[in-house]
Amino acid sequence: MTKVGEHITLDIIGTTKEYDPSVFEKIIQDIAKAAKVTILNISKYKFEPQGFTIIALLAESHISFHTFPEKGIISFDFFTCGKINPSVAVEIIKKEFEHTRIIKKEFNRDTKSFYHDIYSSPGLQKLYVVNLSLIHISEPTRR
């Protein structure tokens, strides 16, 4: 298995107010500082009549927020390369946003795929996992 990074997503449920875009930029900066990652660029877009997206391009990957005020949801995404743990963002986000619930998903980004392969039928998915295993068996061990 070749791991390239860690990825978390948070769905922040039950938000009742629409936050100013500057709040998200400050939170991204706080998360970047806590995770010890480098922000290269921040891009944002305000939708009409509501909603907002902000993404920070990092030297180590990205952080993003997408808001859905009409549904009371803020979606957060943090993908990091190397040994950086994106979970440092969780406590910051819990403190910064009013919410009733947060759904966290975390996973490694790697070559070992036991997830749904969108290009294969169920029968071929199993073949895909077997082929991947055979590739790793045939590769010389790296030390």
Where are these regions (language model features)?
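Catalytic micro-motifs at enzyme active sites that drive phosphoryl/nucleotidyl and oxygen chemistry
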Residues: S64
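Conserved small/polar residues in nucleotide/adenosyl-binding loops
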Residues: I135-T141
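Mature, function-bearing regions of proteins
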Residues: M1-L58, T67-L134
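Ser/Thr-centric signal marking residues that sit
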Residues: T80, T141-R142
